[in-house]
């Protein structure tokens, strides 16, 4: 169970880092938002899902 928690936490940190870099770039580009809207929403949905997964796994471990 600890390995699953560590992997989920690593995925959350990696997704956060990717979104931290990519979202401002998408908003700064001229046609970036209209062409990359689905990618941003998918990344945000993945991030929210990982937050809940890490919370559930944390409650099971401790």
Curated annotation (Swiss-Prot):
One Pfam family linked to the record: Ycf9
Keywords: Chloroplast, Membrane, Photosynthesis, Photosystem II, Plastid, Reaction center, Thylakoid, Transmembrane, Transmembrane helix
Taxonomic source organism: Drimys granadensis
Membrane topology of this protein: Multi-pass membrane protein
PANTHER family, sorted: PHOTOSYSTEM II REACTION CENTER PROTEIN Z (PTHR34971:SF2)
Record NCBIfam families: PS_II_psbZ
Disulfide bonds, paired cysteine numbers: none
Domain of life the protein comes from: Eukaryota
Biological role stated in the UniProt entry: May control the interaction of photosystem II (PSII) cores with the light-harvesting antenna, regulates electron flow through the 2 photosystem reaction centers. PSII is a light-driven water plastoquinone oxidoreductase, using light energy to abstract electrons from H(2)O, generating a proton gradient subsequently used for ATP formation.
Quaternary structure note: PSII is composed of 1 copy each of membrane proteins PsbA, PsbB, PsbC, PsbD, PsbE, PsbF, PsbH, PsbI, PsbJ, PsbK, PsbL, PsbM, PsbT, PsbY, PsbZ, Psb30/Ycf12, at least 3 peripheral proteins of the oxygen-evolving complex and a large number of cofactors. It forms dimeric complexes.
Gene Ontology biological process terms, A to Z: photosynthesis; photosystem II stabilization
Family: Belongs to the PsbZ family.
Compartments reported by the entry: Plastid, Chloroplast thylakoid membrane
InterPro entries, per the entry: PSII_PsbZ (IPR002644), PSII_PsbZ_sf (IPR036512)
Transmembrane parts of this sequence: 8-28, 41-61
Primary site of residence: plastid
GO cellular component, one term: photosystem II reaction center
HAMAP family the UniProt entry points to: PSII_PsbZ
UniProt key word Ubl conjugation: no
Protein name: Photosystem II reaction center protein Z
